[in-house]
């Protein structure tokens, strides 16, 4: 019994010492920083449009494996070049961008994103406002734009961007009886947060655990890639593994394999419902509509059987100007096209891919 008490006493002394040193010294050091534990206070929930950005923000945000971007928002919480006031009306024409993380600009400073490129190119004629935020989908598109129009903000032209992941994201949106979003606020317990934010021991254990989990996931992915490409496991390269990851992520791969999300039709139906509402809203307010379809690596590598055909048919029925950017990514060497135009291991465009999208928009839309 004495040994147990003695051991507990030593552990308590160790934890107290860890707590004191961590808060007085360690948490000010570079090694203490861990992106996963960063307080992304600028990304906020909303009962009106589910989630968005805080207004008047200027921060450096980690993204993906190793990228960091400067994220700046204006007075209405839209990503922008600088913190600035947005009036409800403007003497210039106003272009509204509607989309998800690809249009928000994943991983890059604003000048290298679709929004930034359009804003620079069209600055003499248009004020470009970018409403896009990661994990948006048609239900959020409608709710957010409806909110700002009701607030009195005017727009002349809108570009709606839709990709295959939007259909899956839409499936997970929930509404209450009044039509407001039900926000899932579950997450780590406050006690868990307290431990990893105040003790080097627990913070180190978390990082080791995350590292082991990442390695395990990579090895599993490599095994799947070896089977897909009929290669020996040890001959399967990092490039093979990342190519498999880019083309078989389930949020996009459903377009060529409907067994991945058997209820994808529900996502399509829900998306159509809210896109119909959005189109009516824009038309009722005399806002010109351009509807853009663009591929992920999955749709470049394999035939899109369910996503693009569905929306082409929908656009024709509703007399909507649909522009498909799928042809911009066609070619014989699909792997090379994907690696050349997307962030390695990811679904988002790199700078070259973004420039291809930008050039296509400038050529295909009458600004």
Q: Where are these predicted regions, by residue range?
A:
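Serine-dependent acyl-ester chemistry module
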Residues: 164-315, 325-333
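Loop/turn elements at helix/coil->beta-strand transitions in domains of secreted/extracellular proteins
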Residues: 92-93, 124-126, 153-158, 283-290, ...
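Short, amphipathic alpha-helical "lid/cap" segments that border enzyme active or binding sites
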Residues: 138, 142, 268, 272, ...
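Structural beta-sheet core signal
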Residues: 97, 160, 291-293
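Membrane/wall-proximal cationic-aromatic binding patches
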Residues: 26-121, 233, 237-257, 309, ...
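Hydrophobic membrane-insertion alpha-helices, especially the h-region
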Residues: 6-22
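Catalytic His-Asp segment of secreted/periplasmic serine-dependent ester chemistry enzymes
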Residues: 301-367
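Conserved SGNH/GDSL esterase-like catalytic core that processes O-acyl groups on lipids
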Residues: 104-188
